[in-house]
Amino acid sequence: MSFNTFGHLFRVTTFGESHGVAIGCVVDGCPPLIPLTEADIQGDLDRRRPGQSRFTTQRQEADQVKILSGVMVHPETGVQVTTGTPIALLIENTDQRSKDYSDIQNKYRPGHADFTYEAKYGIRDYRGGGRSSARETATRVAAGAIARKVIAGMTVRGALVQIGPHKIDRDKWDWDEIGNNPFFCPDKDKAAFYADYLDGIRKSGSSIGAVVEIVAEGVPAGLGAPIYAKLDGDLAAALMSINAVKGVEIGDGFASAELTGEQNADEMRTGNHGPAFLSNHAGGILGGISTGQPVVARFAVKPTSSILTPRKTVDRTGHDTEILTKGRHDPCVGIRAVPVGEAMVACVLADHLLRHRGQVGG
């Protein structure tokens, strides 16, 4: 299997499977002399870690990260810093239950990558889905924590803005509420509703989709390049690469199709440090290049395909059958996708910042 690496100058390669011994990543291209410890990474991993509420998978993984290379204690300052060499990170798997998947060893789960992996490679890891499992995203979050160090001065935050058909009230958006509920929801009232709503989904053995919004502030104007290195193009590709993501939009996205030219244009006036925009329908990117406004992206996460409802499928021999999935699964995997989305946006911004410096200096 190839294509486990993304990025150009800030490059991330992930490895490992859901039920393997460990998962991990190698971050190449991180500049030297950036202070970095395992604690800097662990905080982000703890936000994504499973088993923290009844609304996520009950798989219990500590997700303790180990830095294997790429750092050393500076001989003069005594601070551990990056050396500019590849940074290898490892996270051990400790709570696999592969026996839960023995009944589906020869059956394809509808809506899952079971069939397509086997169609391509002639083999698939039925134990938790292997590389197609959301377990792989822990490594992205670890890499994203390093990327945040590279883009110091920029702030990347995410929020769950919709579960099923139920959207938050944007007039009640409060970033401080994100850490007060298990949904990363900025709307206090909607978070309470989501608790009751997801309890019903969870108890029925079903699952539901969600929409996540990522906002990056402090992004300077000028990141990205036409035509095939557009910032929004790379953001879309990075977010689409997250397991279970089926749609991405930047700024107003698909809603812009309903607007007139007068409504959609982000008008400008003279500001203290260049143009001051009167709106941000473009999501902080025009012509593939950042405008200096907040970069805004949203992505849709499909419902978890592993549910308790019997479904029609076929087996590996081509016969019709039914499948009933056991194991521990997220009733709404979109919840834990919030820190994953943040990480991917941070990695893309780090990559584009380094590319921008290489092209125009600064």
UniProtKB/Swiss-Prot annotation:
SUPFAM superfamilies cross-referenced by the UniProt entry: Chorismate synthase, AroC
Cofactor note: Reduced FMN (FMNH(2)).
Top enzyme class: lyase
Entry binding sites for NADP(+): 48, 54
Annotated signal peptide: none
Cofactor(s) recorded in Swiss-Prot or TrEMBL: FMNH2
A biological process from GO: amino acid biosynthetic process
Keyword Flavoprotein among UniProt keywords: yes
Coiled-coil ranges per UniProt: none
Keyword 4Fe-4S: no
Enzyme Commission identifier(s): 4.2.3.5
Binding site for FMN: 131-133, 243-244, 287, 302-306, 328
Pathway participation: Metabolic intermediate biosynthesis; chorismate biosynthesis; chorismate from D-erythrose 4-phosphate and phosphoenolpyruvate: step 7/7
Catalytic reactions on record: 5-O-(1-carboxyvinyl)-3-phosphoshikimate = chorismate + phosphate
Cited Pfam families: Chorismate_synt
InterPro entries: Chorismate_synth, Chorismate_synth_AroC_sf, Chorismate_synthase_CS
Annotated GO CC locations: cytosol
GO molecular function, one term: chorismate synthase activity
NCBIfam families, A to Z: aroC, PRK05382.1
Subunit structure, as described in the record: Homotetramer.
Entry's family note: Belongs to the chorismate synthase family.
UniProt-recorded name of the protein: Chorismate synthase
